[in-house]
Swiss-Prot record:
PANTHER family xrefs: SIGNAL TRANSDUCER AND ACTIVATOR OF TRANSCRIPTION
Coiled coil: none
Record-listed N6-acetyllysine modification sites: K668
Keyword RNA-binding included in the entry's annotation: no
Knockout consequences: STAT4-deficient mice are grossly indistinguishable from wild-type mice. However, the development of T-helper 1 cells in response to either IL12 or Listeria monocytogenes is strongly impaired. In addition, mice are acutely sensitive to methicillin-resistant Staphylococcus aureus (MRSA) infection.
PTM text: Acetylation at Lys-668 is required for JAK2-mediated phosphorylation and activation of STAT4. Tyrosine phosphorylated upon IL12 and IFN-alpha activation, but not by IFN-gamma in T-lymphocytes and NK cells. Serine phosphorylation is required for maximal transcriptional activity but not for DNA binding. Phosphorylation by MAP2K6 at Ser-722 is required for full transcriptional activity induced by IL12. However this serine phosphorylation is not required for cell proliferation although critical for IFN-gamma production.
In-chain residues carrying the UniProt-annotated modification Phosphoserine: S722
Role description: Transcriptional regulator mainly expressed in hematopoietic cells that plays a critical role in cellular growth, differentiation and immune response. Plays a key role in the differentiation of T-helper 1 cells and the production of interferon-gamma. Also participates in multiple neutrophil functions including chemotaxis and production of the neutrophil extracellular traps. After IL12 binding to its receptor IL12RB2, STAT4 interacts with the intracellular domain of IL12RB2 and becomes tyrosine phosphorylated.
Protein name (database record): Signal transducer and activator of transcription 4
Stored Gene3D superfamilies: EF-hand, SH2 domain, STAT transcription factor, all-alpha domain, STAT transcription factor, DNA-binding domain, STAT transcription factor, N-terminal domain
Length: 749
């Protein structure tokens, strides 16, 4: 089943997550129509190869043209219109930057895999539970309900203000009518009494309505103040925490559109309220009287409403997408000097008057004194205007795409880190400033990214990413740049949940409870990973017992191995991966001979091995583990092909493949058949093919096991011998001679 078909079968809560990352950059219609073709292209490689990206973009447009031809025959007018529009947008947007479309599509496919993995994982860790609590959802609904109620109340006071204006005009008309009456009519006692009574009643009604309107406006200001400080800003902080979690591989964060709707409605309501207060001032200027409530209350209400507007705007300026290098989309907030990164800002108050009128300036470490001697400046376009065209949903946004951090030389002439921290523990901040001028108000806004780590060499990326993980799982403080002076510990349950996210986001499949238990045992003697705490040093700085590397270095090497060499096998769930040798033997001891499992090496960085079970002649259960394969060997031969072609020479027997069933009882070819690069090579005699022909050759993974040993002596050595030549040797040499040659000290050369 294709990945897209699997996505379409997800529950609605997961489909909503999928909907979040499909926009005009890569419309879902294209994903649906070209699903099979899209999934067979290597978009990740193309995202770093301009030539390949250009070819894929052209092929994508060709595929669209073919779809257009098909739907034209079906006379589907709406689909024809949409496809033509999409093709025009894609060609215009990506013609000069084909690598960007590869990055976008690669990210979408990766997020699909992560969501599919999350949907299939029964485990929900403490961090994810906290983000999905029912109280949070209830508060979201309450915020939206109260914002709507405030908007309705302001509409009511708008009607009250107009009624007051009409009432005052009527009073003014009657008063002026009296002034123009004949002197005789004015002297009439009856007429005079009636007119005075009428005017007094109208004045009393006017006074009552003014007080009533001001009372309603006061209530609106009070409710808005309470809503903002007790619920709306809490909701914004929750979104920022969800963003932190999503940045380190957790569930996709959403809810920003709902927040924008609330912020915008409140801003519109407050500006409308200010206009109503200005109208009341005009009415009071035209006509006032003793005890008039407008002069006594209007100024204070206007001041409070204006303060709320300032506060609302200051909180509405957010970093929608944190700084990230396009070449490493799964490692946001790690930036390399002189390499471009992207970052996106958004104003949650969407007013048409602000489109293209708000210019944002980016800077780094503004007014911040870091512990490092390293100082940076931003090169590239660091001032841009916000516009609704920057976003598919019309929000007021700005995206910086060409910023580059450049390290400055210190005044002493030194360069680099001379403080107490490693470079990968130094935190920096990117600040964004703008000014809003609207309806007579001038509001200065400033916001900052989450802390970023600056590296000068890609080899520093793994440890820099570890710092980003630890920071964002440990604190909600977005500006604690001295965090690593005294980094707090985290619970083991939290950390292991984040480790599972690394696998689901980076290689498309998270970890199950058994795998997490093994990691827990690796980090501590406890197997219950919901309890206990872990320090930063234990995670990333101290070597594992008896090893020359840290826990994080070991895990990162496994992630890299999966990503580059065994990704399809991992996604299919056929790699048990994290299992100790002791547990491995418990699992295999009662299984059929030839049953094997795949696990990651605990002693070799970035290594994967397989262990199989068989029986000796006297019925004794034996276990054999091949020397771990690393990325060097896997670059020469695909792992699935190794499992298919692996041979063992044991005692006087001919070479045979001992791998029959993937644990627990899956036939090997059924599990891995679709990943074989070709059909198994048949061993045959060499044939005469003339001067122009060659005898075909293949790499054969082969091991020898002595009769007095249960372990392969030359595990995973690749024998560069043609099948034909090997067949000739078998016919002309005895098994003993072949075994002697295989055991030669030169056999592994």
């Amino acid at each position: 089943m294709s990945q897209w078909n699997q996505v379409q079968q997800l529950e609605i809560k997961f489909l909503e997550q999928v909907d979040q990352f499909y926009d005009d950059n890569f419309p879902m219609e294209i994903r649906h129509l070209l699903a099979q073709w899209i999934e067979t292209q290597d978009w990740e490689v193309a995202s770093n190869n301009e030539t390949m990206a250009t070819i894929l973009l052209q092929n994508l447009l060709i595929q669209l043209d073919e779809q257009l031809g098909r739907v034209s025959k079906e006379k589907n007018l709406l689909l024809i219109h949409n496809l033509k529009r999409i093709r025009k947008v894609l060609q215009g947007k990506f013609h000069g930057n084909p690598m960007h479309v590869a990055v976008v599509i690669s990210n979408c496919l990766r997020e699909e895999r992560r969501i599919l993995a999350a949907a299939n994982m029964p485990i929900q860790g403490p961090l994810e539970k906290s983000l999905q609590s029912s109280s949070v959802s209830e508060r979201q609904r309450n915020v939206e309900h109260k914002v709507s109620a405030i908007k309705n109340s302001v509409q009511m006071t708008e009607q009250d203000t107009k009624y007051l204006e009409d009432l005052q005009d009527e009073f003014d008309y009657r008063y002026k009518t009296i002034q123009t009456m004949d002197q005789g009519d004015k002297n009439s006692i009856l007429v005079n009494q009636e007119v005075l009574t009428l005017l007094q009643e109208m004045l009393n009604s006017l006074d009552f309505k003014r007080k009533e309107a001001l009372s309603k406006m006061t209530q609106i200001v009070n409710e808005t103040d309470l809503l903002m400080n007790s619920m709306l800003l809490e909701e914004l902080q929750d979104w920022k925490k969800r963003q932190q979690i999503a940045c380190i591989g957790g569930p996709l964060h959403n809810g920003l559109d709902q927040l924008q709707n609330c912020f915008t409605l409140l801003a519109e309501s407050l500006f409308q309220l200010r206009q109503q207060l200005e109208k009341l001032q005009e009415q009071s200027t035209k006509m006032t009287y003793e005890g008039d409530p407008i002069p006594a209350q209007r100024a204070h209400l206007l001041e409070r409403a204006t303060f709320l507007i300032y506060n609302l705007f200051k909180n509405s300026f957010v970093v929608e997408r944190q700084p990230c290098m396009p070449t490493h989309p799964q490692r946001p907030m790690v930036l390399k000097t002189l390499i471009q990164f992207t970052v996106k800002l958004r104003l949650l108050i969407k007013l048409p008057e602000l489109n293209y009128q708000v210019k944002v300036k980016a800077s780094i470490d503004k007014n911040v004194s870091t512990l490092s001697n390293r100082r940076f400046v931003l090169c590239g376009t660091h001032v841009k205007a916000m516009s609704s065209e920057e976003s598919s949903n019309g929000s007021l946004s700005v995206e910086f795409r060409h910023l580059q951090p450049k390290e400055m030389k210190c005044s002493t002439g030194s360069k680099g880190n001379e403080g107490c921290h490693m470079v990968t523990e130094e935190l920096h901040s990117i600040t964004f400033e703008t000014q809003i001028c609207l309806y007579g108000l001038t509001i200065n806004l400033e916001t900052s990214s989450l802390p970023v780590v600056m590296i000068s060499n890609v080899s520093q990326l793994p440890n820099a990413w570890a710092s980003i993980i630890w920071y964002n799982v440990s604190t909600n403080d977005s500006q604690n740049l001295v965090f690593f002076n005294n980094p707090p510990s985290v619970t083991l349950g939290q950390l292991l949940e984040v480790m599972s996210w690394q696998f689901s986001s980076y290689v498309g499949r998270g970890l199950n409870s058994e795998q997490l238990n093994m990691l827990a045992e690796k980090l501590t003697v406890q197997s219950n990973y919901n309890d206990g705490h872990l320090t930063w040093a234990k995670f990333c700085k101290e070597h594992l017992p008896g090893k020359t590397f840290t826990f994080w270095t070991w895990l990162e090497a496994i992630l890299d191995l999966i990503k580059k060499h065994i990704l399809p096998l991992w996604i299919d769930g056929y790699i048990m991966g994290f299992v100790s040798k002791e547990k491995e033997r418990l699992l295999l001891k009662d299984k059929m001979p030839g049953t094997f499992l795949l696990r990651f090496s605990e002693s070799h960085l970035g290594g994967i091995t397989f262990t199989w079970v068989d029986q000796s002649e006297n019925g004794e259960v034996r276990f054999h583990s091949v020397e771990p394969y690393n990325k060097g060997r896997l670059s020469a031969l695909a792992f699935a092909d190794i499992l298919r072609d692996y041979k063992v020479i044991m005692a006087e027997n001919i070479p045979e493949n001992p791998l029959k069933y993937l644990y627990p009882d899956i036939p090997k070819d059924k599990a891995f058949g679709k990943h074989y690069s070709s059909q198994p090579c048949e061993v045959s005699r060499p044939t005469e093919r003339g001067d122009k022909g060659y005898v075909p050759s293949v790499f054969i993974p082969i091991s020898t096991i002595r009769s007095d040993s249960t372990e392969p002596q030359s595990p995973s050595d690749l024998l560069p011998m043609s099948p034909s030549a090997y067949a000739v040797l078998r016919e002309n040499l005895s098994p003993t001679t072949i075994e002697t040659a295989m055991n030669s000290p030169y056999s592994a050369e």
